[in-house]
């Protein structure tokens, strides 16, 4: 039975931290599905279609190189429902620090109660990407700063275009 993993997130924007998680995740599964969350209460910088396209462009080559099947989807329901929809039994979550662990453990516990067949796997961030957050990247970009150390080149270009003023 193939190991199918779902890596959910808003990916607004895709960061080098997300890329780091994908590099680890493709070694853990036979098929990785990146799920771009669409939340009605949030106003993302990039549309769901833009985030999906960036995620596919950045992550798919990593999966292909690792011999891991790959797909990107959007979802607007519970993460465990999205996992069931695509046949995933593994949820991949990245951890930067203890604060992330505390938060993610709560979510993992709730998810396990709702879907005992879906298991959360935590991937610790590599040291070089631990300080990166999409929130900080957005703040730097909106203020005209250089985000290239924190995001893939494609994303840096898209952010420059988005916030060119």
From Swiss-Prot:
Its main location: cytoplasm. Pathway: Cofactor biosynthesis; coenzyme A biosynthesis; CoA from (R)-pantothenate: step 4/5. GO terms for molecular function: ATP binding; pantetheine-phosphate adenylyltransferase activity. Keywords: ATP-binding, Coenzyme A biosynthesis, Cytoplasm, Magnesium, Nucleotide-binding, Nucleotidyltransferase, Transferase. Its cofactor is Mg(2+). It catalyses: (R)-4'-phosphopantetheine + ATP + H(+) = 3'-dephospho-CoA + diphosphate. PANTHER family: PHOSPHOPANTETHEINE ADENYLYLTRANSFERASE. This is Phosphopantetheine adenylyltransferase. The lineage of its organism: Bacteria, Pseudomonadati, Pseudomonadota, Alphaproteobacteria, Hyphomicrobiales. The gene is coaD.
């Amino acid at each position: 039975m193939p190991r199918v993993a779902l890596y959910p997130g808003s990916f607004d924007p895709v960061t080098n931290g997300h890329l780091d998680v994908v590099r680890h995740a493709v070694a853990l599964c036979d098929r990785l599905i990146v799920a771009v969350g669409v939340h009605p209460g949030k106003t993302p910088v990039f549309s769901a279609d833009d985030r999906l396209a960036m995620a596919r462009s950045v992550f798919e080559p990593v999966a292909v190189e690792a011999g891991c099947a790959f797909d990107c989807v959007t979802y607007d329901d519970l993460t465990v429902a999205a996992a069931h929809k695509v046949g995933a039994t593994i949820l991949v979550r990245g951890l930067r620090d203890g604060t992330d662990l505390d938060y993610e453990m709560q979510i993992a516990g709730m998810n396990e109660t709702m879907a005992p067949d879906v298991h959360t796997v935590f991937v610790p961030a590599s040291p070089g990407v631990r300080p990166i957050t999409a929130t900080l990247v957005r703040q730097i970009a909106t203020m005209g700063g250089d985000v290239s150390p924190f995001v893939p080149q494609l994303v840096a270009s898209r952010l420059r275009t988005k916030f060119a003023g």
